[in-house]
A protein has these predicted regions:
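Cytosolic, long alpha-helical scaffolding segments
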Residues: 185-366, 547-725
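A transmembrane helix-and-boundary motif of multi-pass membrane transporters/channels
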Residues: 1-233, 240, 337, 341, ...
Length: 725
């Protein structure tokens, strides 16, 4: 009788040898794919097999979708760049001036598009591939055609191996990891709701601490949203899930912004004090919202539907009934109750939309937003143009140094000038240069020590390459802040060991690459310090000044008459960039003079965050036309007051009187409350009007604060201009 195979026992025996953590599994996958790519390149007798191995470690990532997305752009950029460089080489081969000019234009244009294109990596690889073909004209012009042919083949082999390994060898799918992220997003937002409730009703936590928690939560939502872009490259899930997750993350992000606006408003302290003396079922509404979040999460993850209505809907109806009784009896606390009811209504409405999309499966149609996108804004940004020109000049200087020094084989290292110069500040350039050197020395050192102690054959090469790439890849995945060191160590190791024909017989490749890296670093820092120098603090003050101009423009357009309105700027990326600069400067030891400028910059940034929150709140949640009609019925011209608020944000401010504007807005609010009692205006209309007038008052207060504090920007700019910075 045939005995069944002991499958379970065999799997149990192998289990200790199967990597468990996702970092270790990805590292093992990377090591095996690198060795496989190098061996295939040997078998196919490719001229430079290390390009195949390098491609696998450059594409390495924990998640399958990220690898495939990057692989597509790498092969597309390489093909376009290599053949574009070859055809361009035919026109410039006899002119040194055209040789330098073409290299400059290639890098400048590529870096320009790298700054805002969704295909940034493809543009960068295209420039690097074309640069390699063109730069080699000075040394071996007869090789241009073969470089254009074989380089894409060598890189394409690495791409195919990486893609196959990503799908077949320990695949880690983003859509599986995102289920965990979804749970964390729901849990994190529930904790924020509880914290806001405790702070508002019981004052258990400080507002500053609450803001920090909201900022940390916002980062986690952005991280989860970024993962969605790679999910479309994977298999095993419905495409509709991407749309659902995007709606979820966008909605939670928007609600987090509403909470931040509410607790950061100038009226928050008075709202707290007024609510303390009112008897409203606010705790019940908050509890219902938290329960509904948990219910939506469970149904979405399990793909079930119990058909029940949200608890928060009924809780909000009870609150509205209590508000009607309170406002009819006493109008003293109407500002506070309208503010909190407006916030809770936003939360409940968003939850209803999420239930329809995530649980009921309805398609979500996003409202059309007339915004000037990040791409449109950056296309004409002078800083982006300057940055691109500096990158092109860095490459030209590195190329000249290389030609003068006649350093053999250092062309691959010269790519450092491109990779380093795409960084936005000198601080980042210093870090990336140091990491590049450390990685080169570590990986090259391991290879050279192996060659010194072992008489290497093919089997030795496989073992050393497998072990080395695994260690460096695991380091990269585990310690993401220093991932670039591990990547460069892998590249140096592969370049040293994977030479044409088999195991290495010379020590030139790592030394040539090290020399090229030093040339690239030197050239980049010379250009960065000599032309449009931008240390981190200077860059921060400049970006804050630019952010202020964009925000002032947005306020003026938001309050402009409807026929004259223009699209607002989407400033999300600029805010994140400024926040990154602030976090970088907090880690640096600044001298006292710069420290005072930095503290002023932090305060100015906080004002701009509040201004942006106010603009977004009015843009997304307020019906301005209804407010104007309500004011007209009370005998007021709200457009005139809006024009006065907008005038506070004009570039040339004359006779600024924010205090008077604020008093007029308060008088209008009081008049509307009186008119509401006499004319029986609906609670929704009054809520809309009172909250809008509160937002206009907040804009007036912010204008006054920024007018006092922004003088330091002009002072700093004048000092820097006088110093020739």
């Amino acid at each position: 009788m045939r005995q069944p195979l002991p499958t379970a026992e065999a799997l149990a025996w192998f289990k200790p040898f199967i990597p468990q953590s996702k970092e270790n599994r990805a590292a093992v996958r990377t090591a095996i794919s690198a060795v496989a790519a190098v061996l295939l390149a040997f078998a196919l007798h490719l001229d430079k097999p290390y390009w195949s191995g390098m491609t696998t470690v450059i594409l390495a990532n924990i998640y399958t979708g990220s690898i495939i997305d990057k692989a597509i752009m790498r092969i597309a950029g390489t093909l376009a760049g290599a053949w574009g460089g070859y055809f361009l080489a035919g026109y410039i081969a006899n002119s040194f001036l055209l040789y330098l000019l073409s290299a400059f234009l290639l890098v400048t244009i590529a870096v320009y598009y790298y700054n805002f294109s969704v295909y940034a990596y493809a543009y960068l690889l295209g420039a690097i591939s074309a640069f390699i073909v063109i730069a080699d004209l000075a040394i071996a012009p007869e090789q241009a055609f073969w470089v254009a042919v074989w380089r894409p083949i060598e890189i394409g082999l690495g791409v195919l191996v990486s893609a196959a390994a990503a799908f077949c060898l320990f695949p880690i799918n983003i859509h599986e990891a995102l289920d965990k992220e979804v749970g964390q997003v729901f849990t994190g937002f529930q904790q924020l709701i509880r914290a806001v409730q405790d702070n508002l009703l019981l004052r258990h936590s400080a507002v500053d601490e609450l803001r920090k928690n909201m900022q940390a939560f916002k980062k986690s939502v952005v991280k989860a949203t970024d993962m969605l872009g790679y999910m479309r490259r994977e298999v095993g899930f419905k495409r509709e899930k991407i749309d659902q997750l995007r709606v979820l993350f966008d909605s939670i992000y928007s609600l987090n912004r509403s909470l931040h606006f509410f607790i950061s408003s100038q009226q928050y302290a008075s709202i707290q004090a007024e609510l303390k003396t009112t008897d409203l079922p606010l705790a019940e509404v908050f509890s219902a919202i938290i329960e509904d979040l948990d219910c939506i999460k469970c149904h979405f993850l399990k793909q079930t539907d119990d058909g029940k209505e949200l608890n928060s809907t009924q809780a909000l109806h009870s609150l509205d009934a209590a508000l009607s009784v309170l406002t009819a009896r006493n109008s003293q606390h109407q500002q506070a109750v309208f503010a909190i009811s407006h916030l809770l209504r936003q939360l409940v409405n968003k939850l209803q939309s999420l239930q329809l999309v995530l649980v009921k499966g309805q398609k979500f149609t996003a409202p059309h937003a007339r915004l000037i996108s990040r791409k449109q804004r950056l296309q004409t940004d002078p800083d982006i143009i300057k940055h691109s020109i500096k990158a092109g000049l860095s490459v030209i200087l590195a190329l000249c140094f290389w030609l003068i020094s006649n350093w053999p084989g250092g062309l691959n290292g010269l790519i450092s000038s491109i990779v380093i110069s795409i960084r936005k500040s000198i601080y980042e350039m210093k870090n990336i240069s140091l990491y590049r050197l450390l990685g080169c020395l570590t990986g090259g050192g391991l290879a050279l020590c192996s060659l010194a102690w072992i008489r290497m054959d093919l089997y030795d090469l496989i073992i050393i390459l497998l072990f080395g790439v695994w260690v460096f890849s695991y380091f990269s995945f585990k310690y993401t802040a220093y991932a670039y060191i591990g990547l460069q160590a892998n590249i140096a190791l592969i370049i040293t060991l994977a030479q044409a024909g088999g195991p290495p017989i010379a020590l030139d490749p790592p030394l040539e690459r090290l020399g090229g890296i030093l040339i690239g670093i030197t050239s980049t820092f010379l250009v960065a310090n000599a032309l449009w120098r931008s240390d981190t603090l200077t860059q921060l003050t400049g970006r804050l000044h630019k952010l202020s101009r964009y925000l002032h423009y947005n306020v003026r357009q938001l309050l402009a008459p409807e026929p004259q309105k223009k699209p607002l700027y989407d400033l999300t990326s600029l805010f994140w960039f400024c926040r990154g600069l602030l976090e970088t400067l907090e880690q640096e030891g600044l001298p006292p003079k710069k420290l005072s400028v930095f503290e002023e910059a932090k305060q100015d940034f906080q004002n701009q965050v509040l201004l942006q929150a106010t603009i977004t709140h009015v843009y997304e949640y307020i019906n301005q036309d209804k407010c104007r009609l309500a004011a007209a019925r009370a005998g007021w011209d709200l457009r005139a007051l809006e024009a006065e608020v907008a005038a506070l944000f004009e570039e040339k401010q004359v006779n600024l009187k924010p205090g008077q504007v604020k008093k007029q807005l308060e008088a209008l609010r009081d008049a509307l409350l009186v008119a509401a009692e006499e004319e029986n205006v609906s609670a929704d209309d009054m809520e809309n009007s009172v909250v809008y007038l509160g937002s206009l008052m907040q804009l007036a207060i912010i204008a006054e604060v920024m007018a006092r504090n922004n003088q330091w920007v002009d002072d700093v700019n004048q000092e820097q201009a006088a110093a020739g910075v």
